[in-house]
UniProtKB/Swiss-Prot annotation:
Protein name stated in the entry: Olfactory receptor 6Q1
Cytoplasmic side: 49-56, 125-143, 222-241, 297-317
A Pfam family the protein falls into: 7tm_4
Chief place of localization: membrane
Task performed by this protein: Odorant receptor.
GO CC annotation terms, alphabetical: plasma membrane
Domain of life where this protein originates: Eukaryota
Organism: Homo sapiens (Human)
Transmembrane segments: 28-48, 57-77, 104-124, 144-164, 202-221, 242-262, 276-296
Extracellular side of membrane: 1-27, 78-103, 165-201, 263-275
Length: 317
């Protein structure tokens, strides 16, 4: 932290270092992340298109998957294009204004929190479908789905308001180089000339509340699902259900594990380079894996993809 001096000028622009230690491999990493980004866009757009066009998928589960796909597109698009511009040295690709930096962090936090709550809602949907199939229509009606989705987006939007407001009250007189590929809270706090103790505490509590609340719903839901599956007599059906749950839990564990590591910590002095690697997992890798695990492995979605992208489907429209 630097001492306050009245004639210092407030920083109006930041420079993002990105992955500064890999200059020789910038083109390789550009191609890698561009491929992953485009793959994520194609996957999620395909799911949105298929669910929207195939009436057989007009069910609550696919309603939530559509919301998740929309969210993943926006989630990756907040940070990845700027990161790609920095890799290839586009003019101003590493520069970002103070206002744009706060906006990027707000949107990214909003979408990340919303995804946590959406994953919890989807886990609850699967819990009711598997553990209480006879009551599924009563507990997961279309009205309930709409209210759950709206609540996820609303609470997600409210989540970053206080943290970003507190961040906007901090002073930044320089240096203005962010040791990250996006405007993340920890490297920003490391640059502030103000006392960041209160800001760190609020970030910790907000992150902990979001992650614990949503992960507890997921843990309880899947715990009950596993208990129910253990009582299925057919070994083939039990194995099929277990493999699906294991795939879901793998992605959820990766997403939540990286988020817990990144945001439920109170010191900005943690390894920035390791944080950047962890950030790649929840901002690039997980959004690419989610459609594969939640949707594209699903036989109904595969069948719908075949129908939607067949000539007969479009001739009948």
């Amino acid at each position: 932290m630097q001492p306050y001096t009245k004639n210092w000028t407030q920083v109006t622009e930041f420079v993002m270092m990105g992955f500064a230690g890999i200059h020789e491999a910038h083109l390789l990493f550009f191609i890698l992340f561009l491929t992953m980004y485009l793959f994520t866009l194609v996957e999620n757009l395909a799911i949105i298109l298929v669910v929207g066009l195939d009436h057989r998928l007009r069910r609550p589960m696919y309603f939530f998957l559509t919301h998740l796909s929309c969210l993943e597109i926006w989630y990756t698009s907040v940070t990845v294009p700027k990161m790609l511009a920095g890799f290839i040295g586009v003019d101003g690709g590493k520069n970002i204004s103070y206002a744009d930096c706060l906006s990027q962090l707000f949107i990214f936090t909003f979408l990340g929190a919303t995804e946590c709550f959406l994953l919890a809602a989807m886990a609850y949907d699967r819990y009711v479908a598997i553990c209480m199939p006879l009551h599924y229509g009563a507990f997961v009606s279309w009205g309930t789905c709409i209210r759950l989705a709206a609540a996820c987006w609303l609470v997600g939007f409210l989540t970053p308001i206080l943290p970003i407001y507190l961040l906007s009250q901090l002073t930044f007189y320089g240096p203005n180089v962010i040791d990250h590929f996006s405007c993340d809270a920890s490297p920003l706090l490391a640059l502030s000339c103000s006392d960041v103790t209160w800001k760190e505490t609020v970030d910790f509590l907000v992150s902990l509340a979001v992650l614990l609340a949503s992960s507890m719903v997921i843990a309880v839901s899947y715990g009950n699902i596993v208990w129910t599956l253990l009582h299925i007599r057919s070994a083939a059906e039990r194995w099929k259900a277990f493999s699906t749950c294991a795939a879901h839990l793998t992605v959820v564990s990766l997403f939540y594990g990286t988020l817990f590591f990144m945001y439920v910590q109170t010191k900005v002095t943690s390894s920035i380079n390791f944080n950047k690697v962890v950030s790649v997992f929840y901002s690039v890798v997980t959004p690419m894996l989610n459609p594969l695990i939640y949707s594209l492995r699903n036989k109904e979605v595969k069948g719908a993809l075949g129908r939607v992208f067949s000539l007969n489907f479009w001739k009948g429209q």
